[in-house]
């Protein structure tokens, strides 16, 4: 089975408690309890960003040990708060050094899971002129991921951290890529709390599902 949950905001190695935010009380234990109730060893869970508050890899170790201790394979994408994410090579070396064996990364690639192919990127949220470089980079990363998915075959399942549509904001560059590859559903995070009310569920024929942890009661969301 395939599940997803975004924005875990773990801080087991850092002093960044989430219980200062309404609704986030005891969130780590709630995630664990719900995960153990649903996810089996042969399942896969996609986590599209904001996994850990660690500022460097060494500050994420306890968070990754926590994740490693949960059943299933895990696929991570980068979020805006994942400042620990340096390069894929360095992160994979960190995993190897610390016996983190159930976690894979998506950045310019795609991963086949049964008859589904997981792809995506962080995305981008703003459209001001000074953000053009970053936005174009994220667009190309999404293109490369989707191209890799085509090579692997299977049904594409797309994850972004940032929603390409939110309130009155629309990232047309990202939407154009989704249209180009005939994507009809996107899973995303980033939005929290009352921001849920401005989340867009469908735009121009594409469905968007917000799966930030607090918006889905800290419970992995079942896809298929």
What spans do the regions from the language model cover?
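Core catalytic region of metal-dependent phosphoesterases/phosphodiesterases
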Residues: 14-113, 172-182, 206, 210-214
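Extreme N-terminal starter segment of soluble prokaryotic enzymes
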Residues: 1-3
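Short, flexible loop segments at boundaries between secondary-structure elements
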Residues: 183-198, 215
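Active-site glycine-centered loops adjacent to acidic/histidine catalytic or metal-binding residues
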Residues: 7, 49-50, 79-80, 161, ...
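Generic beta-sheet signal
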Residues: 77-79, 121, 159, 189, ...
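Short, solvent-exposed loop/turn segments at secondary-structure junctions
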Residues: 54-55, 165-168, 195
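Conserved catalytic scaffold of divalent metal-dependent phosphoesterases
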Residues: 8-15, 82-173, 177
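Short acidic-hydrophobic surface loop/beta-edge motif
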Residues: 107-114, 197-203, 223
């Amino acid at each position: 089975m395939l599940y997803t949950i975004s924005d875990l905001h773990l801080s087991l190695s850092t002093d960044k408690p989430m219980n200062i935010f309404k609704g986030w009380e005891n969130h780590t234990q709630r995630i664990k309890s719900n995960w153990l109730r649903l996810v089996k060893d042969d399942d896969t869970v996609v986590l599209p960003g904001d996994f850990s508050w660690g500022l460097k890899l060494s500050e994420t170790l306890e968070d990754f040990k926590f994740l490693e201790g949960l059943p299933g394979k895990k696929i991570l994408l980068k979020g805006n708060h994942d400042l620990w994410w340096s390069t894929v090579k360095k992160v994979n070396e960190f995993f190897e050094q610390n016996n983190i064996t159930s976690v894979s990364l998506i950045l310019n690639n795609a991963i086949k899971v049964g008859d589904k192919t997981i792809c995506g990127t962080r995305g981008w949220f703003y459209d001001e002129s000074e953000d053009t470089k970053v936005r174009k980079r994220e667009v190309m990363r999404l293109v490369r991921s989707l191209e890799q998915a085509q090579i692997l075959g299977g049904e594409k399942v797309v994850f972004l951290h940032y929603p390409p549509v939110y309130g009155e904001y629309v990232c047309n560059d990202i939407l154009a890529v989704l249209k180009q590859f005939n994507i009809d559903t996107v899973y995303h995070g980033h939005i929290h709390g009352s921001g849920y009310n401005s989340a867009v569920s469908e735009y121009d024929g594409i469905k968007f599902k917000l799966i930030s942890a607090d918006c889905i009661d800290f419970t992995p969301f079942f896809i298929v």
